């Protein structure tokens, strides 16, 4: 199978970028700057914002001072959205394949210690569900499962993708982490995008919430989008689970991650999701500061 080569990238990797900027910790290095950002700085960011990214502009836009400029930011966001994407909205539908999981994440109702009936759709069942989704007019589909590669194998995903690719214009997956060769095999089968949430960029918080299982490896998780792009995938979905750590620090880290990927893998497009905490049954104890209301967004 053919791997996708990219122009030589001479910059640092994402682990180095986050570490040097203090964005793989609890964000305390940035807290003072955020709190001391003035309204005048927000106005300057609005005046010079042409759609190009800079960490300084983003810092101004998510600072407490920016709460007084919500309408101006909304107008600018709309202007840039229409300029880049036109007056269209791209919709996709998720198809849940399995809730078997080998990880033990404190915040997740699917973690392996929870005792409930687990299910994995057969290929035939998945195709039936996909037909219903297609009949509703959706042409983009996201195949989702908890993380257990023995239950939802590469072969399973490959077979399913080959049977779905004539029904949908775009097939993406949100499953477990893989290697470059595995992603390349799925790409050849018709899967063009991968969503992988870092959940939190704070190393200490990550270690606390992801107790055991393959997902407990912070660096492997962080490097996954690189492997996705190296395999030729056209769409890379990123996200942080808002509520696990300081949302402003997470936003800065997420933006730096995306900026790095765009520079290094220019053939792939990067998108964001903003998942948030919702109630879920858990046999595991979580920290006292974990709160459904802790993600105050502008």
Question: How does the language model describe each region?
Answer:
Residues 1-95, 103:
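Flexible, acidic/Gly-rich N-terminal and inter-domain linker regions that tether
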Residues 62, 93-95, 112-114, 142-154, ...:
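Glycine-rich, proline-tolerant flexible connector loops at the mouths of alpha/beta enzymes
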Residues 83-125:
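Canonical Radical SAM [4Fe-4S] cluster-binding loop centered on the CxxxCxxC motif
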Residues 94-96, 146-148, 174-178, 199-201, ...:
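Active-site beta-loop-alpha junctions enriched in small/polar residues
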Residues 105, 139-141, 154-241:
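Radical SAM/AdoMet-radical enzyme domain recognition
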Residues 115-128, 217-220, 253:
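Glycine-rich anion/phosphate-binding loops
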Residues 128-148:
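Short Fe-S-cluster ligation motifs
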Residues 145, 168, 219-283, 292-298:
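Conserved C-terminal portion of the radical SAM core fold
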